[in-house]
A protein has these predicted regions:
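N-terminal cap/lid segment of alpha/beta-hydrolase-fold proteins
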Residues: 31, 36-94
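Alpha/beta-hydrolase-fold enzymes
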Residues: 197-320
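Short, surface-exposed "cap/lid" segments of acyl-processing enzymes
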Residues: 91-136
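Catalytic histidine-centered segment of alpha/beta-hydrolase-like enzymes
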Residues: 409-420
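Alpha/beta-hydrolase active-site loop
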Residues: 148-171
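Conserved alpha/beta-hydrolase "acid-adjacent" motif
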Residues: 385-391
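Short beta-strand/loop motif that positions the catalytic acidic residue
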Residues: 378-380
C-alpha cells in the first residue's frame, strides 16, 4: 500500500512539474495569434516552413568568393581544397548598411538558411556577407587559429579575424554606412560573442546584432542532440541499419545540394526515408552526428591529435578515408568535448577544470554584457528542441523587451515564415519592433 502511495505521489509530482514547466514556457511567449502552421516541434525542425507560408523573396546576385586567412599556413594534403576560406557576398551599388551572416552548426555560407537571410536583407537594402559556421570543415582548415573549435571566445576571435580580412578586400569597392551581424543556432551564439569582442576591438562598432534560436549552453544543447540518437527504432543495436538507410537517402540528397548536411538535409532525408513522426528525433540526432563527425575528423587531422587517426600518420588526397569516417560517425559531440576538446586546451590551461571549460561555453558567461547592451536582440521559439527545460526563460529574463519569443517553430523551423522574416529585417531597420 505504501509503495502504491509513493508511486502515486511521484506521478502527481511529475504532472505538477510538467504543468509548471509548460506554464513557465507559456509565460515567456511574446507573440500572440501566431499562425505558423506546424505545432509539433520535431516536425517543425525537420520540415521547416511550408512553401505557401514562406516570405516572398527575390533572386539576388549571391556570389561565392575565397580568401586566404593564414597565407603562411600549410594545409594537410588530404584537405588540399581547404586552404582558402569560402564565403558569399551580395553587394549593393550605392552606400548601404552591411550585415554579416554566420551560419549554424555544420552549415556553409551558401546553405539554405543563410541564402534566405541574404535575400531578405539584400531586398531591404543591405550589403550582405555570408560566412560558414566555425564548425564547417572549410572554416576549420582555413580560418580556425587553433584548428579545434568550440571555445566561445576563440571562435569569436576567428570569426572577427575573418570579418576584418573580408572587409579589407571589400573596402575599396563598396560604401558602407553601418555594420551589423546576425546568425542562427550556433551562429547566433557566435554573434553574441563577436559583438562583445567588438566592444574592445572597435573595428566595426556594430549598430545592431540579432541572435536567432541560439543555445544558452553549447554543452547542454549538444548533449540533448547527442541523446536524440537513442530514438533510433530498435535502439542503438539498430544504429547501423538506420544509419545506412540514412546514408542512402543522403547520397541522393547530396547529388541535389552542395550543402546536404547543412540546412536542407533534414527535410530532404525525411522525405526520402518516409519516416514516422516518432522517428524524427532519431533523424535529427543522426544528422547532427554526421555534422559533428566531419568537424571532429577535420580537427583531428589538422592538429594531429590522434583521436580518430593514429597520431603521426599523414593522410594525403588519395588516402582511403572510409574507416576513419566509420569511427567518426560513432563519436558524439559530447565525446569530442571530453576526450578531444578538453585535453587539447588543458595543455595550455592546466588549472582550468572540466566544469569550468563547460561553463565558459555559455551565454551565461557574458550575461552581464547581454543585459546591459541595447544593440542586441533575440528571436527564439518556446518549443526549441536544443534548449533544456527552463533555458528559454533565460532569454526573457536577460533580454526583456529585446526578446521576441514565438510559441512554436522548433529549432529554426520558422525562420522562413513570412512573419519571422519581416521581424528579422525589422530588427535592423526599425529597432526590431514586431
Amino acid at each position: 500500500m505504501i509503495s502504491k502511495i509513493k508511486i502515486a505521489v511521484r506521478c502527481i509530482a511529475g504532472i505538477f512539474a510538467y504543468l509548471a514547466s509548460s506554464m513557465a514556457t507559456a509565460s515567456v511567449v511574446t507573440v500572440e495569434n501566431y499562425e505558423y502552421p506546424i505545432t509539433d516541434r520535431f516536425v517543425a525542425t525537420v520540415v521547416g516552413t511550408p512553401t505557401e507560408y514562406e516570405a516572398k523573396l527575390p533572386s539576388i546576385p549571391f556570389e561565392q568568393r575565397s580568401i586566404d586567412i593564414f597565407p603562411d599556413r600549410k594545409t594537410p594534403d588530404v584537405f588540399f581544397y581547404g586552404k582558402e576560406l569560402l564565403y558569399s557576398v551580395a553587394l549593393q551599388d550605392n552606400e548601404s548598411p552591411l550585415i554579416f551572416l554566420i551560419a549554424g552548426t555544420g552549415a556553409s555560407h551558401e546553405g539554405g538558411k543563410n541564402r534566405n537571410m541574404a535575400k531578405a536583407f539584400y531586398q531591404a537594402g543591405f550589403h550582405v556577407v555570408s560566412i560558414s559556421s566555425p564548425t564547417f570543415n572549410n572554416f576549420v582548415t582555413a580560418a580556425s587559429y587553433t584548428g579545434v573549435v568550440g571555445d566561445a571566445k576563440k571562435d569569436a576571435e576567428d570569426i572577427y579575424r575573418v570579418f576584418e580580412k573580408i572587409w579589407a578586400e571589400l573596402a575599396d569597392d563598396i560604401e558602407v554606412s553601418t555594420f551589423n551581424v546576425t546568425g542562427y543556432s550556433l551562429g547566433g551564439f557566435n554573434a553574441a560573442y563577436v559583438a562583445k569582442l567588438d566592444e574592445t576591438r572597435q573595428i566595426f562598432n556594430f549598430e545592431n546584432v540579432l541572435l536567432i534560436n541560439p543555445p544558452v549552453s553549447i554543452y547542454n544543447s549538444i548533449s540533448l542532440l547527442d541523446r536524440m540518437i537513442n530514438n533510433i527504432p530498435g535502439g542503438m543495436d539498430n544504429f547501423d541499419k538506420f544509419f545506412n538507410n540514412l546514408m542512402r537517402a543522403y547520397t541522393n540528397v547530396y547529388k541535389e545540394s552542395a550543402d546536404a548536411i547543412g540546412d536542407d538535409f533534414l527535410y530532404k532525408a525525411y522525405k526520402a526515408l518516409n519516416l514516422k513522426d516518432e522517428q524524427l528525433a532519431a533523424l535529427i540526432g543522426v544528422s547532427f552526428r554526421l555534422s559533428s563527425a566531419s568537424l571532429i575528423f577535420t580537427s583531428d587531422v589538422v592538429v594531429d591529435f590522434g583521436f580518430i587517426k593514429p597520431k603521426g600518420l599523414i593522410l594525403n588526397r588519395y588516402s582511403n578515408l572510409t574507416e576513419y569516417n566509420e569511427v567518426a560517425n560513432r563519436i558524439g559531440f559530447t565525446d569530442y568535448y571530453h576526450e578531444f576538446f578538453y585535453p587539447f586546451y588543458k595543455e595550455t590551461d592546466p588549472d582550468v577544470t572540466r566544469d569550468e571549460f563547460i561553463s565558459a561555453i555559455s551565454l551565461k558567461e557574458i550575461e552581464e554584457y547581454l543585459r546591459s547592451t541595447d544593440k542586441i536582440t533575440v528571436m527564439h521559439n518556446a518549443d526549441d528542441i536544443i534548449l533544456q527545460p527552463g533555458e528559454i526563460e533565460f532569454f526573457a529574463d536577460v533580454f526583456g523587451k529585446r526578446a521576441t519569443i514565438y510559441p512554436t517553430g522548433g529549432h529554426c523551423g520558422n525562420m522562413s515564415y513570412r512573419d519571422n522574416v519581416a521581424h528579422m529585417v525589422a530588427a535592423f531597420t526599425d529597432g526590431g519592433t514586431p
